[in-house]
A protein has these predicted regions:
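Hydrophobic (often cysteine-bearing) scaffold residues that line and stabilize catalytic clefts
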Residues: 62, 66, 70, 122, ...
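C-terminal, charged and often intrinsically disordered regions of DNA end-processing helicases
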Residues: 1-64, 293-294
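Short, polar/flexible loop-turn hinges at active-site or ligand-entry regions and domain interfaces
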Residues: 54-63, 80-84, 188-189, 258-259
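Mg2+/Mn2+-dependent nuclease catalytic core
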Residues: 149-240, 244
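A non-catalytic, helix-rich entry segment at domain boundaries
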Residues: 73-147, 154
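Solvent-exposed, amphipathic alpha-helical segments
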Residues: 69-80, 250-254
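Metal-dependent nuclease catalytic regions and adjoining charged, substrate-binding loops involved
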Residues: 32, 205-294
Length: 294
């Protein structure tokens, strides 16, 4: 898999008039492997358990709320006619899209207004991230074939894979491109492993669903701005699938016994579940057992 790093390519500001992105918490579903849950287990098996099995609530952070809003605005931007996909249109979508998110999710409704109005540079930060997007791509030139798409597949090994894909673009001459937006800080070259893991994960899922791998993987860091572009290799993706098999086997083994051990480290300082962690003299709730579909 080859990689290209590109900081703010020289797209001019789009001219023209102003005009008009995890599986939800509905009915319980059997656990499946996703990039975020895989990262949780590798970071701390107990964290995985509390999120994926106990499903303990966590209040969204301001950064997460901003990310949710920016993803939703970019998704809505692509519903506009191509000529209207300009920076002013994206900024104009913030208020109505934010209102829709609040109406659909009480947790967001409790946090989003404060993030936009009282947090330091709240609304300005959302606008800055949206403006940065236009430094990386010109959406007037793109016509996605899928946006904010839930993808699910079961490998031949029985490992269930699940997640949301931000965008899939059809490419001239055949093939397709997988695009993911990030609103957090861009990693340095030595710390791209987690982001690359996620892109490989979704590329493998699409390979299994479509029978062919993406021709391109684009990871767009709006807080940079920085574009990372990868060219996937199908055989490498299939080897990566065997890595996921091993990871899922470890999760299922822990699930059978309830032995999800804590793994103390620097990230403990910001962990919501530290009060329940034995490594910090906390007591986790009784293990409810591995969830099975009803």
């Amino acid at each position: 898999m080859t990689e290209t790093r590109q900081a703010a390519p020289p797209h001019p500001a789009a001219p023209g008039p102003a005009g008009d992105g995890a599986v939800g918490d509905g009915a319980p579903r059997r656990p499946a492997l996703s990039p975020s849950r895989a990262a949780d287990f590798k970071q701390c098996p107990l964290l995985y358990r509390l999120r994926a099995i106990d499903r303990l609530p966590e209040a969204p952070t301001p950064a997460q709320v901003r990310g949710t809003l920016v993803h939703a605005v970019l998704d809505r931007l692509y519903a506009l006619p191509a000529a209207e996909r300009v920076p002013a249109a994206a900024r104009a979508l913030v208020a109505p899209v934010g209102a829709e998110l609040c109406a659909a999710d009480p947790e967001l409704a409790a946090v989003l207004p404060a993030v936009l109005t009282t947090a330091p540079d709240g609304h300005a930060e959302v606008d800055r991230l949206l403006d940065a997007y236009f430094a990386l791509e010109d959406p007037r030139l793109l016509e996605p074939e899928a946006r904010e798409q839930l993808v699910e597949v079961e490998r031949e090994s029985g490992v269930p894979l699940r997640g949301y894909v931000d965008r899939v673009d059809a490419l001239a001459g055949g093939g397709y491109r997988l695009v993911d937006y990030k609103t957090g800080a861009a990693p340095g070259p030595a710390h791209e492993g987690r982001a690359l893991f996620q892109m490989k994960f979704y590329a493998l899922v699409l390979l299994l669903l479509r029978g062919r791998a993406p021709r391109e993987l684009h990871l767009l860091y709006l807080n940079g701005p920085l574009a990372l572009r990868f060219t996937p290799d199908e055989e490498q993706l299939r080897r990566f699938g065997r890595t996921l098999d091993a990871l899922w086997a470890a999760i299922r083994a822990a699930g059978a016994t309830g032995e999800f051990r804590p793994n103390p480290g620097p990230l403990c300082a910001s962990c919501t579940h530290r009060v329940r962690c034995p490594a910090w003299d906390g007591v986790p709730p009784p293990y409810p057992g591995w969830p099975e579909p009803g």
